[in-house]
Amino acid sequence: MKNKSDLSIVNLSTYTSPVVKEVRGKNFIEYGEDNNYFQYLIDRYNGSPTNNAIINGVSEMIYGKGLDATNSNKKPNEYAQMKALFNNDCVRKLCYDLKLMGQCAVQVIYSKNRAKIVQLEHMPIETLRAEKCNEKGEIEGYYYFSDWSKYKRGNELKRIPAFGTSKEGLEILYIKPYRAGFKYYSPVDYQGGTQYAELEEEISNFHLNNILNGLAPSMLINFNNGTPDPEQREMIERRIYEKFSGSS
């Protein structure tokens, strides 16, 4: 006789850190599954109120009162030039990206004769991917695409040389803290908390869906061959909980 309560148990997938990989035929380095890890971080920022508040607060603390110098009185001309290059809005955005994304990028714009730097602008970090490093292990450029989630092989990419590697009028200064084992990108310092941010988001969605469904049950189990005895019902209920109530 076939066991009516024969159920299979499925373990849910576990959390993994972002994958950084070189793909044959591509000059840039992918970051995360589907090359879209920066968007994953943005989604966790938008979906978790706790994560959102922490990132906003810490980025404001990094910014503080803006960019300053301890020797501004001794070098007033250099200080004035620095303040002219780094406007407050640019610095604030860099601090925000540094906390949210773990890194940030600056567009370095030179004069026509390339005698000096005339402007520094924030570059949204999620629009950049690192070029494969040279034989010396140096990254010589970055590739720009407005939305990497829509990138397809054959789409035109804009290559921007890394700061100090070319004679072009525009370069990218890529700022990232050192992380052991990561050459191209730096994981965020809250890497271990991203799954909790996602968990908070999913719990919110779960309760919202319950409200939108009028608090109706989300699962109904029907036994076509009669009602099992209490012991069998308890075993079936326990197995259903094991299968659907979260990762182990």
Regions found by a protein language model. Name each.
Residues 1-248:
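Structured, contiguous alpha/beta core segments that scaffold functional sites
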